């Protein structure tokens, strides 16, 4: 075959042989295949012949090449070609013979006996699979036929391309089905007779394409095939026979591979026995055990669609493993799809994973044959990447040697179990050696202990061969005779054997094995071995060394490059090294390592050898082959790689010092499962950071004396010398003896400095002797040793003590260990590296050196590394802000013995879990326990007092998320965090505030005190801190996957996405971030399949509903019971169709007494309402939102109140208004506007967008009317971008409200009606109702005491009296507003029975009217002309003149309203002084405000706006407007006041501007010396308005006497009118304005003028009286002079010879002439 013609002949022979079997292959591909064979097997062309043995040898060489170089170096069709050719050469295949015998045994299908049940033929294929027979008349020439063969080779490439991924021949039973057609042809070629019926096994190609011809563009359809067979295949008959035998079909009933029979495909179930064995293998040995992988490889030969692989994995794997498999399966399919796209293969990603348009199983039958092979290959690769199961560690740990079991039998059982679990033989042997010692019985362990790290399994078996029952019996007898334990006898025998071995010199030579001499003098040591060369790898022509090769061409004649250094011999090749470490054991440095990428922060490190880690081994030290020192100025931080953490390898972080020169090692453990670490596997990384040196250092280098940041403690042998240690105590050095028996250290008095204080100790000191009243240090002393350990202690001082004693108070802080020869301690020391009779040491030389760090999980042994740490961040909750640092101590109340025992158990449990810690805190809160229904106790703490001292955080999630917002058709994963509060640590500074005490009965012992380290139950901020902590942990996932729909509420997390692959990828990353923050996912609560239980909902694929609630009605007895029931109903109401009118009977039950314990009974209507609720719960169907389609807000016109629903094919969320309306009267369209606004708000809140359209129950004309006349309607649609419609879909769910009567305003008009009847109405509080109809007056006396109610009565009478159209006017705006809305008000919300009755009667009359009406408002007491004003005035007078029979009644009515004084009443109503006084005295309010007159002189103005006094008074009941600024015109006493929020300058200026707008500008303004009046801004203001401003005497209020009395008058008037006022709403502005009205307009002087009349009225020209007056300064009398003002206690006199008037006290004035009617004169009201 070395010649060209022979190679062409060989290619032609292979082509003909394959074509004869129905397989057309391109000659070009065969030539390329043979070229690759020649490259891999250089000896193959020289053999000259090809037989089955030679071809199998070629296959082995191909597999070896594949293993060494990977799939990239092997063409994709190589294994397929090799398999096809192997089948052609193998005529004696056992499988072929077995199948032939099986076929021969079948009966002739034409003569099937009656006993055999008939078998229905498989169903016909879908239309896309049907083939059309080709035209048999076509004929081709030889040239055309050759071209067609070449094209057919390309066409049939997919038929056998799937074999490219197979590693071996398809010879197992499970692979028989997929290769059925190939084997059939092979049987025929081998001469085996098949049944004669051609329909059963047609001689057709084994894999006809079953897809439509249009799949491959540009190719003609293949030739047709005969009709399908009606008989079963052997596999089908085997399945039917198994079913007839009663085999139970397992969970694999959905696993159906695709078979091809002629030109049809059908879908047939796999043998359930095969799948059942697979499931058992997964549960017993694990999904990645070799036995399980072999079954998966066998299953992979079937043409399984994606759905079958998913179903198989779901049935065999656990929930977590299934998620991992599915995620990896999707990744593998994505890679294959990328390759297919590049090569033009039309097998897409959706086809491979079975999603999208290929989700249904029927559509998966149309795939190309090669697609099934790719799917199976991806599924197998994903299965192989599953992690090893942690439960298999327990299985291995259970394989233990029995007391009487031979050791070799035990090892055989162990090897058999490991072989089924582990595929790596080398790693399995390492594990077997370890378990062969650990799981052996005590006798074998004692014999193997000295050799456990030196010998192998064969040595172990040889050593323990003689250990049996007789051996153990002899050991027991020896122990009994010596009085020792069996273990001590075994140790004694071991030590004796060790000494004997050392003394004897009969051991053989280590080189040649012969006895009598040592290896150093062995004659064979220096003899060199002679090696013979094999085939030259360079020229492949002969057997010689490559360095000696002189050939210039290879065996095929190709030129070869020259050999460099042909005459010289180069150095031997070094060990293989890697960029991230050393796997060959050579010494490497940090400088030899390379970073993975340019941006890599750390240097990767790997293990140098195979290592097996088990949970029982604890932490192990792994060598890296990399040595220090680090680069100058740096220090190394050793961390684990994330990929290693995902595989279950825990890398413990450590610090590599800058001066460390030893080998850098990795501390690794496998806490959960068995882990195999291969040589060269990257598991850790070294991060170099700058070295910062602060403080003092010891002047020595670490070199290679220790690994990590600190050395192990030195172990010192006990000798005759005392174990002394020098300490530095408070800057002084002391040397002392280590005393492990001393509880506390003692310093000799002769070494005690005289300047250090000391005191008498309270307790005695006992030891060998006893010392009473010893001395002790008065203060804590700080000690420090030379290794840097430090601490504080309070030593005793004893006289006559020769040496200082360092007790356990110091030794415990130093971490000193004791070593004793007990068996327990010996076991620990042996694990740390101790050799018997040699002491400790790394090199087993007996030299005392620091031990290698090999800590165990139980923290026993020498040198403890912090096992609890890993390379995860230390996180805790945010610190809490506190109002005070004052400790809060609440005494613990006593507990009964039962509760105390329960509390102690719960506290110990929390202490063991690390949730609490011992405490000495100054805070204390009591604890108590309660027993749950299950019988378990629960620990609670009363933190109410502590909660009062903290700043409360706001709620981060004020509402519950709705599942409706989850995108429709999404894949969902729901997880629950386990004990979320208890996994979140408190801020360290906050722990002390949550301390508690555990009491004891009868104070038998001090209380044990603890404090919480995690979020405690009952703390106000615990929910908020929990939410924020979890939100921070999952924030990176939200940022990395912005399209992921992630819902987090407390400890529940939901993930949803339409891409399942991305969902599982995000879930995997989410678990990592939660784990890094210390949050634990409850594995049993991971939900990956429908239905999901989430936040009280049950989520199904297309809908969800609330979990069914059973309404309990037997306990409904009080108001509190009904309140709780309606609270629960209100929570689920947004997900139920429950209109307000359905629940109204239950709402009515809540009315009445507000006492929570007040009795309530369930009415018949209430029971009906509860039945409606239960029916709504049963029929609920809420769907998910499809954001790609339109959805909207529908307003349903239900009775009493409208109902809203966000709707998309089905309801998304129901919307209801409050059962208690905000106003007493609201029209129906106003309620519709309210629910529209609420619906828009909830759409944005829950779905993040406005509803695309809103459907309202109003036509377009009605909508126009609402936009014109309803403000709330316009506000509801403000800035709405969507569409408004009134067309409802034909859905029964939305049509249920259409039958209800819905009212729109029809009778009440907004505009007056032309030529209608004119009506005026009025009502008075005296119960008189007046009615004027077309100038005819009517009145009636009612029992109502409210004017508005009386007016409603009058309106009702008008509606009953006038049936035709009318226009009604009234002066009550309240009545008019109510009448314009009452027609469409569904619910009258007033609580007054009188008003409710009248409104109901008016509404009923309006609903029955035929003619429209108009209700208008007209202002009362208007001076405008016109008939409307006159008509209203007539109705108003009609309500008064009928009952005002005298002026006294009128005065009494006026006083009841305004509370004037008696003088004003006498002048206003012309009644006697005594009658007026009696009215005031009979008032229930006014007598308490009588004031006595105060006499004094205060300057007054001589005309209006001459002199003002301004001040500020405070009225607290006005709230923020309590600052009342008051100004008074001193001439007329006219008052001006305004309300402000302060009394600064700007408020004073605002008040004066208000006064100027009504009264003008004064000439002079007098104020006090307050800062608001003395500021520069106020002075500039007065100057701008040309006002002369002056102030009084500081701190003397008499200068402001007039305005001060005005303050009192205003306050008294406000108190008078405070009670029983129904004229207006009680606002501060209304009250103050009313008081000013009474004081300015209704308070009259002696002349009958009010302050307003005196201020704005005309000046009187009457003659001024003359008086004589006395000057108080000169005591001289002057006059007579005219009097300008004569007030109460003061007189203003204008001397004739003066320029200005004088103010004189009234007692210094005498009349010069008699005044007219002086006897009837009265003082000014002031």
UniProtKB/Swiss-Prot annotation:
Binding of Zn(2+) occurs at 1455, 1459, 1483, 1486
E.C. number: 3.6.1.23, 3.4.23.-, 2.7.7.49, 2.7.7.7
Q: Name one Pfam family in it.
A: RVT_1
| Boundaries of every G-patch domain copy | 821-866
The residue ranges flagged as biased composition, category Pro residues, are 119-128
Choose one Gene Ontology CC annotation of this protein and give it.
viral nucleocapsid
* Co-factor requirement: Mg(2+)
Integrase-type zinc finger segments: 1446-1487
UniProt motif PTAP/PSAP motif: location: 202-205, 287-290
Q: Where is the signal peptide?
A: none
Work out whether the entry's keyword set contains RNA-binding: yes
Ligand binding (Mg(2+) 2) = 1322, 1351, 1371, 1436
For this chain the motif PPXY motif maps to 208-211
All copies of the Reverse transcriptase domain together span: 911-1099
Q: Where are the zinc fingers (CCHC-type)?
A: 507-524
Any idea which positions bind Mg(2+) 3? 1511, 1568, 1604
Q: Where is the lipid attached (N-myristoyl glycine)?
A: 2
Cleavage (site feature) positions: 99-100, 256-257, 477-478, 713-714, 831-832, 865-866, 1446-1447
**Sequence segments annotated as region (Disordered):** 103-148, 550-570
Q: Where is the Peptidase A2 domain?
A: 734-810
Binding of Mg(2+) 1, residues: 976, 1051-1052
How does the cofactor bind to this protein, according to its record?
The RT polymerase active site binds 2 magnesium ions.
Provide the family line. Answer: Belongs to the retroviral Pol polyprotein family.
PANTHER family on file: ENDOGENOUS RETROVIRUS GROUP K MEMBER POL PROTEIN (PTHR41694), RNA-DIRECTED DNA POLYMERASE-RELATED (PTHR41694:SF3)
* Entry text on domains: Gag polyprotein: Late-budding domains (L domains) are short sequence motifs essential for viral particle release. They can occur individually or in close proximity within structural proteins. They interacts with sorting cellular proteins of the multivesicular body (MVB) pathway. Most of these proteins are class E vacuolar protein sorting factors belonging to ESCRT-I, ESCRT-II or ESCRT-III complexes. Gag-p12 contains two L domains: a PTAP/PSAP motif which interacts with the UEV domain of TSG101, and a PPXY motif which binds to the WW domains of the ubiquitin ligase NEDD4.
Report what the protein is called: Gag-Pro-Pol polyprotein
Q: Specify the species.
A: Sheep pulmonary adenomatosis virus (Jaagsiekte sheep retrovirus)
């Amino acid at each position: 075959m070395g010649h060209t013609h022979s190679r062409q002949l060989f290619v032609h022979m292979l082509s003909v042989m394959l074509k004869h079997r129905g397989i057309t292959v391109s000659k070009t591909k065969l030539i390329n295949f043979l070229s690759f064979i020649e490259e891999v097997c250089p000896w193959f062309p020289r053999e000259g012949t090809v037989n089955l043995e030679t071809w199998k040898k070629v296959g082995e060489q191909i597999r070896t090449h594949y293993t060494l170089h990977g799939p990239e170096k092997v063409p994709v069709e190589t294994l397929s070609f090799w398999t096809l050719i192997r089948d052609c050469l193998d005529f004696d295949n056992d499988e072929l013979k077995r199948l032939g015998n099986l076929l021969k045994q079948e009966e002739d299908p034409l003569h099937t006996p009656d006993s055999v049940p008939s078998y229905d033929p498989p169903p016909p294929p879908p239309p896309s699979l049907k083939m059309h027979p080709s035209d048999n008349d076509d004929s081709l020439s030889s040239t055309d036929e050759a071209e067609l063969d070449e094209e057919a080779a390309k066409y049939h490439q997919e038929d056998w391309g799937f074999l490219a991924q197979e590693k071996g021949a398809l010879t197992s039973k499970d692979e028989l089905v997929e290769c059925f057609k190939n084997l059939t042809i092979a049987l025929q070629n081998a001469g085996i007779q098949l049944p004669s019926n051609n329909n059963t096994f047609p001689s057709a190609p084994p894999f006809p394409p079953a897809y439509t011809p249009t799949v491959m563009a540009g190719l003609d359809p293949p030739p047709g095939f005969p009709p399908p067979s009606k008989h079963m295949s052997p596999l089908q008959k085997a399945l039917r026979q198994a079913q007839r035998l009663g085999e139970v079909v397992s969970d694999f009933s959905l696993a159906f591979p695709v078979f091809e029979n002629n030109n049809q495909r059908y879908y047939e179930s796999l043998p359930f026995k095969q799948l059942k064995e697979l499931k058992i293998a997964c549960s017993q040995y694990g999904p990645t055990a070799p036995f399980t992988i072999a079954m998966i490889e066998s299953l992979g030969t079937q043409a399984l669609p994606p759905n079958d692989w998913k179903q198989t994995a779901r049935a065999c794997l656990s929930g977590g493993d299934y998620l991992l498999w599915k995620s990896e399966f999707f990744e593998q399919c994505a890679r294959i799809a990328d390759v297919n796209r590049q090569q033009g293969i039309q097998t897409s990603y959706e086809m491979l994973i079975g999603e999208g348009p290929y989700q249904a199983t029927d559509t998966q039958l149309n795939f190309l044959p090669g697609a099934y092979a790719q799917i199976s290959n991806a599924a197998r690769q994903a299965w192989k990447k599953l992690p090893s199961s942690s439960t298999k560690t327990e299985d291995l740990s259970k394989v233990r040697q029995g007391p009487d079991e031979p050791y070799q039998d035990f090892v055989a059982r162990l090897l058999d179990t490991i072989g089924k679990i582990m595929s790596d033989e080398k790693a399995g042997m390492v594990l077997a050696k370890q378990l062969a010692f650990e799981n052996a019985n005590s006798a074998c362990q004692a014999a193997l202990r000295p050799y456990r790290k030196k010998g192998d399994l064969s040595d172990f078996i040889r050593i323990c061969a003689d250990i049996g029952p007789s051996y153990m019996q002899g050991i027991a007898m020896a122990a009994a005779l010596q009085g020792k334990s069996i273990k001590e006898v075994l140790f004694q025998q071991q030590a004796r054997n060790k000494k004997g071995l050392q003394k004897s010199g009969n051991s053989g030579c280590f080189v040649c094995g012969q006895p009598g001499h040592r290896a150093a003098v062995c004659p064979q040591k220096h003899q060199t071995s002679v090696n013979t060369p094999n085939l030259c790898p360079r020229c492949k022509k002969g057997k010689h060394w490559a360095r000696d090769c002189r050939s210039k061409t290879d065996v095929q004649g190709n030129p070869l490059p020259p050999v460099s250094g042909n005459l010289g011999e180069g150095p031997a090749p070094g060990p293989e090294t890697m960029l991230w470490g050393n796997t060959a054991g050579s010494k490497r440095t940090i400088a030899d390592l390379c970073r993975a990428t340019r941006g890599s922060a750390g240097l990767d490190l790997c293990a140098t050898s195979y290592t097996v880690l088990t949970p029982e081994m604890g932490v192990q030290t792994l060598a890296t082959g990399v040595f220090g020192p680090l680069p100058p100025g740096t220090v190394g931080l050793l961390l684990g790689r994330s990929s290693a953490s995902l595989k279950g390898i825990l890398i413990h972080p450590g610090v590599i010092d800058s001066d460390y020169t030893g080998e850098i090692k990795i501390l690794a453990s496998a806490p959960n499962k068995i882990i195999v670490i291969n040589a060269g596997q990257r598991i850790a990384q070294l991060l170099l950071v700058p070295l910062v040196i602060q403080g003092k250092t010891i002047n020595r280098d670490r070199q290679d004396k220790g690994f990590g940041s600190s050395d192990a403690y030195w172990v010192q042998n006990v000798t005759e010398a005392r174990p002394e240690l020098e300490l530095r105590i408070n800057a002084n050095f002391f040397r002392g003896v280590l005393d492990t028996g001393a509880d506390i250290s003692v310093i000799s008095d002769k070494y005690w400095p005289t300047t250090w204080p000391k005191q008498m100790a309270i307790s005695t000191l006992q030891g060998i002797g006893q010392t009473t009243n010893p001395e002790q240090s008065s203060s804590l002393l700080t000690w420090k040793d030379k290794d840097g350990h430090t601490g504080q202690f309070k030593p005793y001082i004893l006289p006559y003590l020769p040496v200082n004693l360092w007790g356990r108070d110091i030794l415990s802080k130093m971490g000193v260990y004791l070593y004793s020869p007990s068996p327990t301690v010996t076991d620990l020391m042996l694990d740390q590296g101790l050799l018997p009779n040699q002491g400790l040491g790394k090199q087993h030389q007996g030299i005392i050196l620091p031990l290698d760090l090999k800590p165990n999980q139980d923290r026993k042994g020498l040198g403890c590394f912090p096992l609890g740490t890993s390379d995860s961040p230390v996180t805790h909750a945010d610190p809490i802000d506190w109002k005070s640092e004052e400790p809060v101590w609440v005494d613990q109340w006593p507990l009964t013995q039962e509760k105390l025992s329960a509390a102690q158990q719960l506290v110990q449990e929390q202490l063991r879990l690390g949730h609490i810690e011992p405490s000495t805190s100054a805070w204390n809160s009591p604890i108590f326990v309660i027993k749950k229904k299950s019988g378990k106790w629960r620990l609670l703490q009363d933190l109410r007092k502590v909660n009062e001292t903290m700043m409360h955080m706001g709620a981060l999630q004020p509402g519950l998320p709705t599942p409706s917002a989850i995108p429709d058709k999404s894949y969902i994963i729901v997880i629950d965090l386990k004990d979320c509060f208890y996994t979140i640590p408190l801020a360290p500074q906050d722990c002390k505030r949550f301390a508690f005490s555990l009491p004891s009965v009868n104070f038998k012992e001090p209380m044990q005190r603890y404090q919480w380290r995690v979020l405690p139950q009952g703390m106000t901020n615990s929910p908020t801190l929990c939410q924020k902590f979890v939100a921070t942990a999952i924030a990176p996932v939200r940022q990395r996957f912005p399209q992921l729909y992630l819902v987090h509420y407390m400890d529940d997390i939901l993930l949803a996405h339409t891409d399942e692959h991305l969902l599982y990828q995000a879930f995997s990353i989410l678990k990592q971030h939660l784990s890094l923050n210390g949050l634990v996912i409850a594995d049993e609560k991971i939900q990956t399949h429908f239905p999901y239980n989430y936040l009280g909902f049950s989520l199904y694929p297309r809908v969800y509903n609330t979990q069914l609630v059973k309404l309990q009605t037997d306990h409904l007895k009080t108001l509190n019971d009904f309140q709780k029931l309606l609270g629960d109903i209100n929570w689920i109401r947004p997900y139920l169709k429950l209109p307000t009118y359905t629940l109204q009977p239950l709402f009515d039950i809540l009315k009445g007494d507000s006492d929570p314990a007040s009795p309530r009974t369930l009415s018949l209507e209430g029971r009906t309402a509860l039945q409606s609720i239960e029916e709504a719960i049963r029929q609920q169907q809420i769907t998910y939102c499809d954001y790609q389609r339109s959805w909207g807000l529908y307003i349903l016109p239900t009775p009493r109140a409208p109902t809203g629903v966000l709707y998309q094919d089905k309801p998304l969320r129901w919307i209801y208004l409050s059962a208690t309306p905000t106003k007493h009267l609201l029209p129906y369209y106003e309620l519709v506007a309210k629910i529209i606004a609420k619906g828009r708000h909830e759409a944005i809140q829950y779905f993040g967008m406005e509803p695309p359209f809103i459907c309202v129950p109003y036509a377009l004309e009605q909508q126009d009317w609402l936009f014109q006349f309803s403000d709330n309607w316009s506000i509801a649609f403000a800035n709405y971008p969507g569409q408004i419609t009134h067309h409802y879909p034909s859905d029964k769910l939305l049509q249920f409200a259409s039958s209800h009567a819905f009212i729109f305003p029809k009778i009440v008009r907004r505009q007056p009606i032309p030529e209608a009847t004119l009506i005026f109405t009025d009502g008075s509080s005296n119960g008189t109702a007046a009615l004027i109809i077309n100038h005819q007056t009517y009145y009636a006396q009612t029992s109502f005491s409210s004017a508005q109610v009386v007016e409603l009565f009058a309106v009702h009478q008008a509606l009953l009296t006038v049936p035709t159209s009318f226009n009604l006017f009234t002066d009550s705006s309240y009545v008019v507003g109510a009448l314009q809305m009452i027609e469409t008000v569904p619910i009258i919300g007033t609580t007054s029975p009188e008003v409710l009755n009248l409104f109901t009667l008016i509404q009923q009359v309006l609903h029955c009217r035929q003619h429209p009406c108009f209700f208008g408002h007209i202002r009362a007491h208007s001076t405008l002309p016109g008939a409307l004003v006159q008509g209203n005035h007539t109705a108003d007078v009609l309500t008064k003149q009928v009952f005002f029979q005298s002026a006294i009644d009128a005065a009494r009515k006026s006083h009841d309203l305004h509370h004037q004084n008696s003088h004003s009443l006498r002048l206003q109503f012309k009644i006697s002084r005594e009658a007026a006084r009696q009215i005031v005295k009979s008032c229930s309010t006014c007598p308490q405000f009588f004031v006595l007159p105060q006499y004094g002189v205060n300057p007054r103005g001589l005309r209006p706006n001459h002199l003002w006094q301004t001040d500020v008074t405070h009225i607290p009941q006005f709230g923020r407007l309590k600052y009342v600024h008051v100004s008074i015109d001193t001439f007329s006493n006219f008052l001006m006041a305004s309300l402000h929020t302060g009394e600064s300058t700007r408020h004073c200026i605002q008040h004066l501007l208000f006064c100027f707008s009504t009264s003008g500008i004064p000439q002079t303004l007098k104020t006090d010396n307050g800062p608001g009046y003395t500021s520069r801004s106020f002075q500039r203001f007065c100057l701008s308005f040309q006002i002369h401003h002056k102030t009084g005497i500081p701190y003397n209020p008499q200068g402001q006497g007039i305005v001060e009395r005005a303050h009192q008058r205003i306050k008294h008037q406000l108190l008078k009118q405070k009670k029983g006022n129904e004229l207006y709403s009680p606002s501060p502005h209304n009250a103050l304005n009313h008081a000013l009205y009474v004081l300015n307009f209704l308070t009259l002087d002696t002349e009958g003028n009010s302050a307003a009349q005196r201020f704005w009225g005309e000046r009187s020209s009457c003659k001024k009286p003359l008086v004589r007056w006395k000057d108080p300064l000169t005591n001289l009398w002057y006059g007579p002079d005219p009097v300008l003002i004569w007030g109460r206690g003061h007189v203003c006199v204008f001397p004739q010879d003066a320029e200005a008037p004088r103010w004189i006290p009234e007692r210094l004035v005498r009349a010069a002439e008699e005044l007219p009617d002086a006897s009837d004169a009265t003082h000014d009201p002031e």
